[in-house]
A protein has these predicted regions:
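C-terminal motif of bacterial Sec signal peptides marking the signal peptidase cleavage site
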Residues: 8-11
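Bacterial signal peptide processing site
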Residues: 13-16
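Start-of-domain marker
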Residues: 20-55
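A cross-kingdom marker for long, charged
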Residues: 27-28, 185-188, 192-275
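Short, structured motif recognition centered on aromatic/hydrophobic residues
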Residues: 30, 44, 101-112, 120, ...
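Extended intrinsically disordered, low-complexity coil regions enriched in Ser, Thr, Gly, Ala
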Residues: 41-49, 57-68, 114-128, 175, ...
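Mid-chain, structured segments of secreted extracytoplasmic proteins
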Residues: 57-96
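Extended amphipathic alpha-helical interaction segments
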Residues: 106-225
């Protein structure tokens, strides 16, 4: 999942740098939610480094193979169904990371104190207030502008500069596929409630046997997998938007997309080999 975010948000030049910094970035992100104490910090830092080492050795080749398949199809017409097929192929890679991380995280999360759970509640409340202000309570025209801006930024990271005509086509697709912010909000609250329920249920448990550790990890994996599920309607809309844009791609944009994907593959191969 973290690698997917890297690919979406970064250019090739920054991918290797952030990937190798993921344990540090993840630690401080988690500290912002749980106020990690001195007893928990060493195990968490070591666990995050171990997850990254496992991902480099075991997951990067599969991710790179998928990127290679995508690159080879770029010069051909692509349907929304094909786009969704690539996303579906990536899901096992996301789940593998979630599952591996849960095995490590469960051992630390059970040590959270009551004060840390209250800290978590405050952090969630703050983030939810910001999310509501940006998305749920915003004017429709502002929502469309924000959605369009994000879509164009993500497309330009792969394809390079986008023309006014292409921007209007993306805007038309976004207008046709209305995003259900209320449903997204309810999903957000449900996932947060499920995770908080796990934290409360397992806080203070002694995981001193392989069976106890496995049960805690599997329970956490189920919570995280449910939270990571992508609603089918949103997935299909995103896939169709990408397919529509692909049909408008210029030769220069095609060349840039190929260059971008080849850069990703080169960086991931280097990371896999220890870079």
């Amino acid at each position: 999942m973290t690698l997917c975010l890297c690919l979406t948000l970064l250019g090739c030049s920054a991918l290797k740098l952030l990937y190798n910094q993921l344990p540090t970035v993840s630690y401080w992100w988690l500290d912002g939610y749980f106020d990690i104490n001195d007893q928990q910090a060493p195990d968490l830092k070591l666990g995050l480094r171990d997850v990254l080492a496992w991902h480099k050795a075991n997951e990067l080749p599969a991710v790179n193979a998928l990127l290679s398949d995508v690159e080879q199809q770029l010069e051909k017409p692509i349907t929304g169904a094909q786009m969704c097929g690539w996303f579906t192929r990536f899901e096992p890679r996301v789940n593998a990371v979630l599952d591996r991380t849960a095995v490590m995280a469960a051992l630390i999360l059970v040590t959270l104190t009551a004060d840390q759970l209250r800290y978590f509640d405050k952090a969630i409340a703050k983030n939810n207030a910001e999310w509501r202000e940006e998305w749920l309570d915003a004017r429709p025209e502002d929502l469309m502008e924000s959605r369009l801006e994000r879509a164009i930024e993500n497309l330009e990271r792969v394809y390079g500069p986008i023309s006014r005509q292409q921007t209007e086509a993306v805007k038309a697709r976004l207008a046709k596929d209305a995003y259900d912010f209320e449903q997204n909000w309810q999903n957000r609250l449900r996932n947060q409630t499920a995770f908080k329920g796990w934290l409360v249920a397992y806080r203070g448990r002694v995981l001193d046997t392989p069976e106890a550790k496995q049960a805690a990890a599997q329970s956490l994996q189920a919570v995280w997998r449910a939270a990571a599920e992508w609603r089918m309607t949103e997935r299909q809309q995103t896939c169709q938007l990408l397919a529509d844009f692909h049909s408008l791609m210029t030769p220069a944009q095609w060349a840039q997309a190929v260059k971008t994907y080849q850069g990703y593959q080169k960086d991931l191969q280097s990371l896999h080999l220890g870079g």
